[in-house]
């Protein structure tokens, strides 16, 4: 069975914080997703510390592509498409000077960047070259949750081990395509 994913032009061309959809938008979405997962599992208020580990190309180019900043902002619950750009620098200064961040903007935890945000430049996770691992600990440093995410391009992320679920579209897309050539052919035919 072939599962097709419907994409809009708005999925392909996005407004969001940069400079990179794979190295900035994706990691911010992954960090926010992990914080939301903690909340969904009822673990947010028991979380005393979170660590984020970057692998592969995220680790190699992370600081230059603002991946470190994206992780901090995502853990705070910010989203690349709705973030107030004027809030970025004050939030980062607060986190870095206090060595604390607010998970989802409301649960304050310790976060010492050199200890809690690690760049593994010589390692790659098995699922993709843009891999991240997030771990939440309680006050006794017991692991509450650990998840791996992959930034697969365009700001899209997948969580390792999460099964892909086919979503039934409410309506058939007007122009299905499997390649760039087919997309261009639809464009030419429609004018």
Segments from the language model and where they lie:
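Short glycine/serine- and small hydrophobic-enriched flexible loop segments
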Residues: 29-39
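Generic hydrophobic, aliphatic-rich segments that mediate packing or membrane embedding
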Residues: 30, 67-68, 130
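Terminal domain-start leader segments
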Residues: 2, 39-41
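C-terminal regulatory domains involved in ligand/effector binding and gene-expression control
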Residues: 74, 79-191
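A structural-propensity feature for long, helix-poor, extended segments
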Residues: 45-84, 88, 92-95
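Short, hydrophobic/aliphatic alpha-helical segments
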Residues: 2-16, 52-53
């Amino acid at each position: 069975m072939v599962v097709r994913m419907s994409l809009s032009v708005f999925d392909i061309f996005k407004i969001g914080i940069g400079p990179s959809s794979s190295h900035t938008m994706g990691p911010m979405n992954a960090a926010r997703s992990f914080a939301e997962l903690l909340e969904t599992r009822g673990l947010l208020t028991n979380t005393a510390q979170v660590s984020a580990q970057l692998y592969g190309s995220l680790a190699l180019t992370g600081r230059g592509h603002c991946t470190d900043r994206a992780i901090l902002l995502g853990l705070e619950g910010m989203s690349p498409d709705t973030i107030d750009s004027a809030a970025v620098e004050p939030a980062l200064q607060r986190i870095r000077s206090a060595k604390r961040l607010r998970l989802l903007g409301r649960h304050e935890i310790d976060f010492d960047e050199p200890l809690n945000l690690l760049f593994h430049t010589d390692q790659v996770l098995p699922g993709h070259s843009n891999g991240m691992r997030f771990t939440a600990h309680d006050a006794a440093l017991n692991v509450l949750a650990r998840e791996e995410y992959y930034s697969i391009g365009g700001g899209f992320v997948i969580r390792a081990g999460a099964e892909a679920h086919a979503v039934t579209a409410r309506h058939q897309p007007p122009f299905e395509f499997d390649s760039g050539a087919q997309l261009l052919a639809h464009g030419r035919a429609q004018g």
